[in-house]
Amino acid sequence: DAGIYLTASGEEIKKFNARDGLAMSRLNKNGLRVAILSHSKNIDIIRKRADMLGLETWYAGQEKKSLILARWAQEYGIPPESMLYLGDDLNDLDAFRYVGVGVCPADADPLIKKHAALILESKGGEACFRELADRAFRDLLLFEP
């Protein structure tokens, strides 16, 4: 939902969608490399979410997203044109230009929508990853290893 929640003491809290999490976890267990790539400054929250979902591949920081994707492409032997990226804002544009398929939620920035191969019906934070998984990888979601 693009929201950043802060407590009175200044602690950052993030909301994650449980349906997105189930889809990420299942796809990852079934052989698709699912990763989290965030410009969040709160590395601990992203690490904790990745751990909860069993995801080994994640990044939180300010480096250009395309550079992180290039690193992962080399590390895992994945051609960039075989990568799919889900993003919603201007800081995702370089990633959209790097990967083969860019996907965005319904409420993405207009420039991101212009570069997207697919615009989902769901808004960010409202199970848009799950929508993507249901559309593209339904059989893998149903299989529980």
Question: What do the predicted segments below correspond to?
Answer:
Residues 39-40, 62, 106-109:
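Short secondary-structure boundary segments
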Residues 44, 62-66:
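Feature captures the catalytic cores and cofactor-binding loops of soluble hydro-lyases/lyases
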Residues 1-33:
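Active-site neighborhood of HAD-like aspartate-dependent phosphohydrolases
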Residues 4, 42, 127-128:
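Cytosolic catalytic headpiece of P-type ATPases
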Residues 2-7, 46-53:
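Short, basic/glycine-rich phosphate-binding loops at helix/coil junctions
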Residues 10, 17, 52, 57, ...:
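Mg2+-dependent phosphoryl-transfer enzymes with acidic/Ser/Thr/Gly-rich catalytic loops
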Residues 24-48, 96:
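Substrate-recognition element of Asp-dependent hydrolases with the DxDx(T/V) motif
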